[in-house]
């Protein structure tokens, strides 16, 4: 929606999106995805329905939908602090999430990760590798990579990145070697976000006790070897993860 894009200070409009997708199809790309943000100040549930409908009408193969995060130091954060814009409403964002989930499912795009839906055979390879803790490379300014338990990231500024490459230097800014405990916590954090769920083998008895309470309240399902989020459980996935990894 144009007024939503204006609040987010975006320079494109819906017509640009349609044009870009048409060009991508013409260029031969077999999988095309659209990224959406919901919960923008001033965005109604009807606005969001129209946005998702417009995206699905383009016959795309994949949708990513993310709740708006107001980052400190941004223009949007300053506008909210001054009272010019309202703080995103959590209940409305929950309704928006459930709406995009249902609309995607109705059009044959099934969720495979909390924020991602795809037609059969069109799940994002990078997203899946990241969520499953496999090796992956990130190219470009600020990009992160993960190889054999080591995480590293590049300098953020494009000019600095370019200068290092032209000088024959590595653009890597810093790195860290994940401990066994960190790797396990990340496997829990990321695994529970996936449709196939979290392996019970990764959990300790006290963690299963916490999850049993969530099962009692209808937020998770626990079968022989996996923990699965229910639709309402997906709305509080971050809270569940915090409670089982502290």
Regions found by a protein language model. Name each.
Residues 1-202:
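C-terminal scaffold of the Radical SAM
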Residues 53-55, 208, 232:
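Generic N-terminal initiation segments characterized by hydrophobic and/or small/turn-forming residues
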Residues 161-163, 223, 246:
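Short, intrinsically disordered/low-complexity patches at protein termini
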Residues 202-217:
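Short amphipathic alpha-helical interaction segments
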Residues 215-225:
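A short, conserved structural fragment
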Residues 226-230:
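Minor-groove-contacting beta-hairpin "wing" of winged helix-turn-helix DNA-binding domains
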Residues 232-246:
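Short, amphipathic alpha-helical interaction segments positioned at domain boundaries
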């Amino acid at each position: 929606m144009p007024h939503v894009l204006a609040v987010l200070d975006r320079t494109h409009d819906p017509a640009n999106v349609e044009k870009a997708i048409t060009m991508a199809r013409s260029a031969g790309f077999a999988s095309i995805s659209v990224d959406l943000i919901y919960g923008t100040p001033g965005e109604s549930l009807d606005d969001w329905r129209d946005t998702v409908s417009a995206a699905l009408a383009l016959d795309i193969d994949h949708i990513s939908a993310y709740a708006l995060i107001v980052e400190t130091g941004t223009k949007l954060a300053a506008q909210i602090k001054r009272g010019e814009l309202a703080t995103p409403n959590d209940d409305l964002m929950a309704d928006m999430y459930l709406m995009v989930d249902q609309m995607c499912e109705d059009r044959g795009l099934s969720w495979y990760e909390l924020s991602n839906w795809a037609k059969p055979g069109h799940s994002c390879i990078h997203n899946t590798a990241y969520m499953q803790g496999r090796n992956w490379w990130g190219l470009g300014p600020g990009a992160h990579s993960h190889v054999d338990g080591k995480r590293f990231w590049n300098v953020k500024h494009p000019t600095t990145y370019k200068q290092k490459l032209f000088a024959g230097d590595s653009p890597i800014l810093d790195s860290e070697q994940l401990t066994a405990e960190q790797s396990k916590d990340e496997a829990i954090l990321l695994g529970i976000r996936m449709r196939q769920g979290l392996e019970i083998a990764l959990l300790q008895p006290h963690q299963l006790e916490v999850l049993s309470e969530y099962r009692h309240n209808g937020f998770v399902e626990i079968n022989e070897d996996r923990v699965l989020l229910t639709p309402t459980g997906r709305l509080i996935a971050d809270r569940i993860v915090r409670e089982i990894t502290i």
